[in-house]
Structure formats: C-alpha cells, structure tokens
Amino acid sequence: MKPSAIVYTSNTGFTKRYAEMFGEKTGLCVYSMEEAKTRLEKGTEIIYFGWLMAGSVAGYKKAAKLYDIKAVCGTSLAPTGTLVEAMRKSCGLSEDFPVFNVQAGMDRAKLNGGYGFGIKMLIKIMSKKKNRTAEDNAMLELLIKGGDYVCEENLTGIFDWYNRI
C-alpha cells in the first residue's frame, strides 16, 4: 500500500519546497511535523522529508515514533545521491529500506539557532584545508555564497520508487 501523506521538518525552507513539490506531483497531502501531529493518526503510513544535520536526518526519530515511515528523503548541501549510506546508518535503516538524498541549498540568513555559527566554523576549517578537492571547493563556495539547488530532477529516485510501489 502506498503512503498516504508526506511529513517534513525544514529549517530554511528547502526541505519544505521538496516535500511540496513531491506532494504536488503525487497527490499526497503534505504536513510539517507540527501540523501532522494534529492532522494524522498515529501509525499513518508516510514518506518523511528532513534536512541533514551533522550526519543525521532532522526529526526522523520523532517521526518514526509517531508514524509508519515507508521512505526517507534527506535534503543536504551535498550532491543528490551522495549521502544515502550515511543517512541509512544514522537512522538505523536496513539495506532494503528506501532512502534518498537530494541537494537542497544554503541560505545563511535563514539559519535558525546555532546553525549559523556552525556554518561559520565549517567555512574557517575548510578555508584552511590544504589540497582541497574540486568537491571541497564547490562546497566551500556554497557555504560562503549560498545557493539553491531545489529542482524536480533531484527527486527522480524517489519518484521512481513511489511509482513502483
């Protein structure tokens, strides 16, 4: 049976945009984690979208206690598809569980809490790194200048999975 809703946790809006984009194309209702608490019954089958923070998917553990998660889509600064195994490990998910990672973006002006400070520290560390790779340079540029990579093409993997179930 297909999931009946999408639940997301977003910090700067990129994850929300991906969840809404996926919902629009699939016809699934989309709820923030807060909205879902009052709109969905415990145990509802969902797809969970969350942003990656220090290697883990924000809000995943809380969502897993409330809902029957059928797939996880994490948004990050890294290129689409590159962090799937790290996400799987941090969430404690089996090899056959559907996990997806999509590149989102960076808007430092919208960062909440101490995350802005963390990004500043990461920029300092990466700037001092010797022998940076092309990937390191691209990430550093994204951290400094910001950027928006949200696009439907990045959701191809999760669309393919959804259409198969």
Segments (PLM) and residue ranges:
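N-terminal beta1-alpha1-beta2 submodule of the flavodoxin-like/Rossmannoid cofactor-binding fold
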Residues: 1-66, 160-165
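FMN-binding flavodoxin-like domain, especially the glycine-rich phosphate-binding loop
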Residues: 52-165
